[in-house]
Amino acid sequence: MTGPTTDADAAVPRRVLIAEDEALIRMDLAEMLREEGYEIVGEAGDGQEAVELAELHKPDLVIMDVKMPRRDGIDAASEIASKRIAPIVVLTAFSQRDLVERARDAGAMAYLVKPFSISDLIPAIELAVSRFREITALEGEVATLSERLETRKLVERAKGLLQTKHGMTEPDAFKWIQRAAMDRRTTMKRVAEVVLETLGTPKDT
């Protein structure tokens, strides 16, 4: 069981909220996740219910359909993301791919196009969780929006170099930067700057 766990909490399954207005799809998705060891803490049939359940249960992840009654998935995702409750994976039909950019702007961390299999779903979940942790960690380090954007840009470039030059995965590269900052009692921004300087890539002017 590799999908729902992390090194730190290997025995604890991820807690998932599912928001999907089609009952059969919602049931299939819940069964699929339970078989992989995830815990389903709530099931919502519309966007408003999804927001309410997210605030109530504080899940580790929200899987949200884009098109839902009462309140669409993008609007609901925007509120959940703005409150930093949990990372969000959005589900969209092939014909709705134009909505993916809107979903990303709303704060979704990953998306899947229906129909999908469990082999598609697990990587999307892990990507969403990883990105959410990065953003949360970076926001805890810097106060202003402009500083956050600058720091994220530097960290993204440093991660790219670590992936290219040292063969790290994206999550491993971020963990390396985060751990280096903690070990040296400095900021992730400073570590990213050192990585860029050391690997010979000039900083932006």
UniProtKB/Swiss-Prot annotation:
Transmembrane segments: none annotated. It comes from the Bacteria. It is found in: Cytoplasm. One of its GO terms (biological process) is transcription antitermination. One of its GO terms (cellular component) is plasma membrane. Phosphorylated and activated by PdtaS. One of its GO terms (molecular function) is anion binding. The modification 4-aspartylphosphate is found at residue 65. Its main location: cytoplasm. Keywords: Acetylation, Cytoplasm, Phosphoprotein, Stress response, Transcription, Transcription antitermination, Transcription regulation, Two-component regulatory system. The keyword Glycosyltransferase does not apply. The modification N-acetylthreonine is found at residue 2. Residues 135-196 form the ANTAR domain. Member of the two-component regulatory system PdtaR/PdtaS. This two-component system plays an essential role in mycobacterial adaptation to poor nutrient conditions. PdtaR probably acts at the level of transcriptional antitermination rather than transcriptional initiation. In addition, the PdtaR/PdtaS two-component system controls copper and nitric oxide (NO) resistance downstream of the intramembrane protease Rip1. This coupled Rip1/PdtaS/PdtaR circuit controls NO resistance and acute lung infection in mice by relieving PdtaR/PdtaS-mediated repression of isonitrile chalkophore biosynthesis. Two signals are required to fully inactivate the PdtaR/PdtaS system and mediate NO resistance: a cytoplasmic inhibitory signal through the PdtaS kinase mediated by direct sensing of NO and the production of PPE1-5', an NO-induced small RNA, to sequester PdtaR. Contains a C-terminal ANTAR domain, which is a RNA binding domain. This is Transcriptional regulatory protein PdtaR. It comes from Mycobacterium tuberculosis (strain ATCC 25618 / H37Rv). The gene is pdtaR.
